[in-house]
Regions:
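Extracellular/periplasmic juxtamembrane helices and adjacent flexible linkers that interface
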Residues: 2-3, 26, 37, 68-70, ...
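Ligand-binding pocket segment of bilobal, Venus flytrap-like solute-binding proteins
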Residues: 213-278, 285
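Short helix-loop capping/hinge motifs at secondary-structure junctions, enriched
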Residues: 171-177, 196, 209-217, 291-298
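C-terminal motif of bacterial Sec signal peptides marking the signal peptidase cleavage site
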Residues: 18-21
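Bacterial N-terminal signal peptides that target proteins for export
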Residues: 1-11
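Ligand-binding cleft/hinge of the Venus flytrap
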Residues: 93-100, 180-240
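N-terminal segment of the mature folded domain
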Residues: 26-29, 33-39, 50, 60-196, ...
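Periplasmic-binding protein-like
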Residues: 158-163, 225-228, 236-237, 266-295, ...
C-alpha cells in the first residue's frame, strides 16, 4: 500500500466512549498501566472530543529499583492527534513491560492534529509526536523541533496507515457502495469542516482523487465536490463530533477513517462501513523531537511502535500496519482495487495550496458559497 507510480496531471466516535481523530477541544484524564492494559476505553473515557491524558505511571517494581542506568524513572511527553488514544493505552502498557520501557512514565496529550502541531511549535513539551497529516510534521521540521531526516526509516516515517471509508447505518439501508452514491438526491452526508479537522482533508482528497481515478477531468472532479457538499448536512469542528453525531442519528453516511469505523463497531456501535474501490491511503507520521531530554527512551518507544509487537497492537485495534508481514486475526484490511496516495495528487504541498489555501483554495470557495466558516 505504498505510493503508486502515476502522478495525476492536475494535481471520524460516539459521545460516550470513542475518541476520534480531529477534535479541537481538550480535556484531562489520568491513566495507569493496569487500566490501559485492561481496556483501551479506560484511557479514552474522558470525552468524545480530544483529550489530554495525564501521567501514565511506570510499574511499581521499576520505580522501586530505579532502572536502566538512568538512576530512576523518566517521563516522556507524547503529543498526538486523538484517534490513536485507545491504541496508545495498550501500546504504552506493553512498552512498560519491556526492559527499555520499565522505567518510563508518560504524559499524553491528544487533540486535533493541526492544533497539536501548533502547540508544540508554541512550546508545549514533546518527546514523541504523531500526527494525522504530514503537513503538521513539516511544521515541526521547519521549527527545528523534528530533524529533517525523521522519515529515513523503511516506513518513511509513517507508523500506521488507514483508508478513507464510508460509514453507514446498520444494514446499509441507503445502499451506499461508492462515491457516486453520496451525491444522489436525498442522501444526507456528514464530514467535518476541513478548516478545523485534519480528517476532513483526507476525506475531501479521497473524494476528489476517486473521481480522477475514474477518468474524470479536474473540472468534473471539482463539480463532484460541489455536488457532494450540497448533500453535507453538518460540518462539525472535529471528526469525533461528526462520528458522535452520526451515531446519535444524524445523516445517512459519514466519511471517515477505516480505523474509526472498526473501533466504533468494536465498542458496540450499530454501524456498518464501505471501502470504495477508489479511495485514498491515509498515512500517519511519527517522530522523536530534537528537543527531547530523553532521546534514548524516546527512540526506544518509537522503535517499539514500529516493532512486530507494536504494529500488532495497532493492527488489532483497527490500523493498517506499516511493518511488512504483520497481520490481524481481528481485522482483514482488504486492499481496494483503486487505492491511491497523496503523492498521486501531487503531494501535500500542492494539495494544500489547491484545495485549502485560505484565499484561493477550491474548498475555501465551495465552503464560502455554502456559508460555512473557513477559519477556526
Amino acid at each position: 500500500m505504498r505510493p503508486l507510480n502515476r502522478v495525476l496531471a492536475t494535481i471520524a466516535v460516539s459521545s460516550l466512549v470513542l475518541v476520534a481523530g480531529c477534535s479541537s477541544k481538550k480535556s484531562t484524564a489520568t491513566s495507569s498501566p493496569s487500566a490501559s492494559a485492561s481496556s483501551p476505553a479506560a484511557a479514552a473515557s474522558t470525552s468524545a472530543s480530544a483529550s489530554t491524558a495525564a501521567t501514565s505511571s511506570a510499574p511499581a517494581s521499576a520505580a522501586a529499583s530505579g532502572s536502566a542506568g538512568s538512576g530512576g524513572d523518566v517521563t516522556l511527553n507524547l503529543v498526538a492527534y486523538s484517534t490513536p488514544q485507545p491504541a496508545y493505552a495498550k501500546l504504552i502498557a506493553a512498552f512498560q513491560q519491556t526492559p527499555a520501557g520499565a522505567h518510563v512514565k508518560f504524559t499524553q496529550s491528544y487533540g486535533a492534529s493541526g492544533d497539536q502541531a501548533n502547540a508544540v511549535v508554541s512550546g508545549q513539551p514533546a518527546d514523541v509526536v504523531e500526527f494525522s497529516l504530514l503537513t503538521d510534521m513539516t511544521k515541526l521540521v521547519k521549527a527545528n523541533i523534528v530533524a529533517p531526516d525523521w522519515n529515513s526509516n523503511a516506513q518513511k516515517g509513517f507508523v500506521t496507515d488507514s483508508v478513507v471509508s464510508l460509514v453507514t447505518r446498520k444494514g446499509n439501508p441507503k445502499g451506499i457502495k461508492d462515491w457516486s452514491d453520496l451525491i444522489k438526491p436525498g442522501v444526507k452526508v456528514l464530514t467535518p469542516n476541513p478548516f478545523s479537522s485534519g480528517s476532513a482533508r483526507w476525506n475531501i482528497l479521497g473524494a476528489y482523487g476517486a473521481q480522477i481515478k475514474e477518468g474524470k477531468t479536474d473540472a468534473e472532479a471539482t463539480d463532484y465536490l460541489k455536488s457532494l457538499f450540497k448533500n453535507v448536512i453538518v460540518q462539525d469542528a472535529s471528526g469525533s463530533k461528526a462520528l458522535a453525531d452520526f451515531v446519535g442519528g444524524a445523516g445517512d453516511v459519514l466519511i471517515s477513517y477505516e480505523n474509526e469505523a472498526i473501533y466504533a463497531q468494536a465498542k458496540g456501535q450499530v454501524v456498518d462501513y464501505v471501502i470504495p474501490n477508489d479511495t485514498l491511503l491515509i498515512e500517519n507520521p511519527l517522530a522523536v523531537t530534537t528537543t527531547t531530554k530523553h532521546p534514548v527512551e524516546a527512540k526506544a518507544f518509537v522503535d517499539f511502535l514500529y516493532s512486530q509487537a507494536g504494529q500488532q497492537i495497532f493492527a488489532d485495534i483497527g490500523y493498517r500496519p506499516t511493518l511488512p508481514g504483520v497481520t490481524s486475526t481481528v481485522n482483514k484490511f482488504p486492499t481496494p482495487a483503486g487505492l491511491f496516495t497523496i503523492a498521486d495528487l501531487g503531494g501535500w504541498t500542492a494539495a494544500t495550496t489547491k484545495f485549502f489555501d485560505p484565499t484561493t483554495g477550491l474548498i475555501t470557495a465551495i465552503e464560502k458559497s455554502n456559508g460555512v466558516a473557513t477559519t477556526k
